[in-house]
Amino acid sequence: MCLTSAVAAARLTAASSATAPRRTARIASNSNARRGSTTRLNAVFTPPDPTKVKPLPVRIGHGFDLHRMELLTEMPGLELWLGGIKLEHDRGCVAHSDGDVLLHCIVDAITGALGMPDIGQLFPDNDPKWKGCTSDVFVTEACRLMREAGYEIGNMDCTIIAQRPKISPHKDAIRANLAKMLGADESVINVKAKTHEKVDSLGENRSIACHTVVLLNKV
């Protein structure tokens, strides 16, 4: 190695050694800063107060839910409920309550529009009193909060995602039941169904899911 190359190599090594500790210290400092700024969350759940909802002209909420489905031959007693309507199928939903994904995501859409806690906080699955509960109970409570906050259903659009069973033969019954449950006109409730093209757990009929978007109008 020529003298010039040797000097350059020595300078590069010295520069690397000098900068490495500073880089490490800077990373550690940032890490400590993050740890130091962590805020401990309050584990005590405070029930929502409808009177504190800001009175906007309209509010929009989105809800999503998914439940695993198992064969009735493997888990007898399971059932498949959608929008408060029982569907005959060779599989049923595994859930703490009745596993009605449509009603569950409607609850989340309504409470989400109001800026309130989700269904898991309002009706926790570790509370035995909700074990096997029919989901219309949850919808009734969400509607109570909505009305006490001074709102009504303006429009609701639901999309059920399931490979089987076919939802189309049941859509009218589901829609009518939702309108009755929500105290809304059928014309503002829409129910759609999509398959998942045999992809992942939804497409393999091992789960069922639903999305709901709701528009709330100030009364």
Q: Where in the sequence are the language-model features?
A:
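N-terminal chloroplast transit peptides
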Residues: 1-29
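RNase III-family endoribonuclease catalytic core
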Residues: 44-177, 181-182
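Pyridoxal 5′-phosphate
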Residues: 191-195
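C-terminal edge-of-domain segments
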Residues: 203-219
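Positively charged, low-complexity, intrinsically disordered RNA-binding extensions
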Residues: 196-204
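Short acidic capping loops at alpha-helix termini that bridge into adjacent secondary structure
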Residues: 185-188
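Detector for Asparagine
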Residues: 30-32, 42, 126, 155, ...
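N-terminal plastid-targeting presequences
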Residues: 23-56
